[in-house]
Amino acid sequence: MAIPRRSLTELDQNAAGAHFLIVEARYYDSIGAMLLAGAKAALERARASHELVSVPGALEIPIAIEIATDQAKRAGAPFAGAVALGCVIRGETYHFEIVAAESARALMQLAVAHKLPLGNGILTVDTEAQAEERADPDRGDKGGDAARAAVALHCLARRAGALS
């Protein structure tokens, strides 16, 4: 099995004082735990804090982000960004394609509509072994990658003066 490629791009990862939302789908619990460990470590390295919300599956992630970010904004403490974590493993039916495409589409629409720095860490794989390799913080670290993407977008928005 090929080792997933790692991004070598150095991006701004100083999010000191920023508070991020992590929404995780724990349908595959052990994979979810690895994704979460990577995301939490990346946010810690960026000196950011986080709040965690868990949902049953990948399709519930976008609406959970919408609800939580709206609530935080109304409370006067908006999130600096969000990290979506989950896993969709191909099965024998068309369900995989629906969940993979619709969760990604909804996340992109949410991020663009609300100018929300968002890292998509929803794995879409053929096998559980592929998911484990990509989720493991010591190998693929896709949870960490998603958090680093959200932090980089937050830093970009901060530099552009686009934060509310």
From Swiss-Prot:
UniProtKB keywords: Riboflavin biosynthesis, Transferase
UniProt cross-references to Pfam families, sorted A to Z: DMRL_synthase
UniProt GO BP: riboflavin biosynthetic process
Signal peptide: none
Enzyme class (EC, first level): transferase
Disulfide bond residue pairs: none
Recorded metabolic or biological pathway in which this protein acts: Cofactor biosynthesis; riboflavin biosynthesis; riboflavin from 2-hydroxy-3-oxobutyl phosphate and 5-amino-6-(D-ribitylamino)uracil: step 1/2
Active-site residues from the entry: H95 (proton donor)
Gene3D superfamilies attached to this UniProt entry: Lumazine/riboflavin synthase
The protein's Enzyme Commission number: 2.5.1.78
InterPro entries in alphabetical order: LS, LS/RS, LS/RS_sf
Gene Ontology molecular-function annotations: 6,7-dimethyl-8-ribityllumazine synthase activity
UniProt: 5-amino-6-(D-ribitylamino)uracil binding residues: Y27, A58, L59, E60, C87, V88, I89, N120
UniProt binding sites for (2S)-2-hydroxy-3-oxobutyl phosphate: E92, T93, R134
GO cellular-component term (any): cytosol
Catalytic activity: (2S)-2-hydroxy-3-oxobutyl phosphate + 5-amino-6-(D-ribitylamino)uracil = 6,7-dimethyl-8-(1-D-ribityl)lumazine + phosphate + 2 H2O + H(+)
Similarity section: Belongs to the DMRL synthase family.
NCBIfam families in the cross-refs: lumazine-synth (TIGR00114)
Function: Catalyzes the formation of 6,7-dimethyl-8-ribityllumazine by condensation of 5-amino-6-(D-ribitylamino)uracil with 3,4-dihydroxy-2-butanone 4-phosphate. This is the penultimate step in the biosynthesis of riboflavin.
Full protein name: 6,7-dimethyl-8-ribityllumazine synthase
UniProt gene name: ribH
